[in-house]
């Protein structure tokens, strides 16, 4: 409301932000701009609602060789650990200071050896001097460039689920999460098959959002293009963020030998969401010591969880229902 303008500007100044009143809402359906006493723009609301000239593009989604997605990714555990997908990227992480602002909840690598990579970034919300909070945000990303190159729909769809799964493994409630996307594609020109790639990818993100009830706020495209015969590969990165108390943030490294290890999964969306909800409830009740969102197979998960505290893993094939787990929450 107009009477709140001064209070709003004062609140912005307290946050070191500049704020100015730049317009007044009127009953007349016209946008009028003045400069030095002269009217420099006078446009009707009807014209603004057209959003300019109507544009159309032909789209053709090409056939996909999805058999490529079913091929084994790695020939051995050593190959997996040495791959770009599964390597720790520790050298890259150490080029950045994760302690700036003293708000970090999770270090980039956990455990006494600092060898288990964190799957999320967790940091306390900034507050004014003299204030304190235990409220943090957790943020995670999802992207598989190989999947997106083969099938942009599958790659983008899975990117959303991967980013959300990492939040759940950190202790967050997926129902409170929001998304943002960063996408890169080749120059589209007037070629329907090129238009089909971003079309498929965005359709994949929409389907995933509708299934999870999560909204995407904004997006970013900063590296799309084509240079001579070199095209930017189809890429869609999903970023997910959710609020979480600092004391409820989970780190992924195994904490102590003898702890049982469970696999939470779902064959379809509804069963997967039920698994996520069961894990979240257990985490809030202090029953979860460590969690990892499976991204590149179970082997990668247990290897990374083992590195931080040098705790091994022995598998035993036993089925446990979520009902059974809930019965043991107390």
Locate predicted features.
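Glycine/proline-enriched, intrinsically flexible loops and inter-domain linkers
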Residues: 1-328
């Amino acid at each position: 409301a107009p009477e709140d303008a001064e209070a709003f500007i004062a609140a912005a100044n307290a946050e070191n932000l500049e704020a100015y009143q730049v317009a007044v809402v009127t009953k007349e359906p016209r946008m009028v701009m003045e400069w030095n006493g002269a009217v420099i723009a006078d446009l009707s609301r009807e014209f603004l609602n057209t959003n300019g000239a109507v544009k159309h593009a032909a789209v053709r989604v090409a056939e996909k060789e999805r058999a490529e997605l079913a091929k084994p990714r790695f020939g051995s555990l050593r190959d997996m650990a040495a791959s770009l997908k599964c390597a720790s990227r520790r050298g890259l992480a150490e080029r950045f200071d994760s302690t700036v602002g003293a708000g970090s909840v999770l270090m980039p690598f956990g455990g006494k050896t600092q060898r288990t990579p964190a799957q999320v970034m967790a940091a306390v919300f900034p507050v004014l001097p003299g204030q304190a909070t235990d409220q943090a945000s957790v943020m995670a990303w999802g992207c598989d460039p190989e999947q997106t190159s083969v099938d942009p729909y599958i790659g983008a769809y899975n990117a959303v689920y991967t980013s959300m799964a990492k939040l759940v493994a950190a202790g967050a409630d997926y129902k409170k999460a929001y998304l943002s996307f960063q996408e890169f594609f080749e120059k589209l020109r007037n070629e329907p098959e090129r238009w089909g790639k971003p079309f498929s990818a965005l359709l994949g993100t929409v389907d995933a959002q509708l299934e999870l009830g999560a909204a995407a706020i904004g997006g970013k495209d900063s590296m799309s293009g084509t240079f001579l015969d070199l095209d930017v590969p189809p890429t869609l990165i999903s970023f997910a963020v959710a609020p979480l108390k600092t004391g409820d943030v989970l780190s992924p490294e195994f904490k102590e030998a003898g702890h049982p290890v469970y696999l939470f999964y779902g064959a379809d969306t509804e069963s997967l969401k039920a698994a996520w909800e069961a894990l979240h409830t257990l985490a809030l009740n202090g029953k979860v010591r460590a969690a990892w969102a499976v991204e590149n197979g179970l082997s990668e998960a247990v290897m990374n969880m083992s590195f931080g505290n040098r705790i091994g893993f022995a598998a035993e094939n036993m089925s446990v229902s979520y009902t059974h787990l809930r019965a043991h929450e107390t």
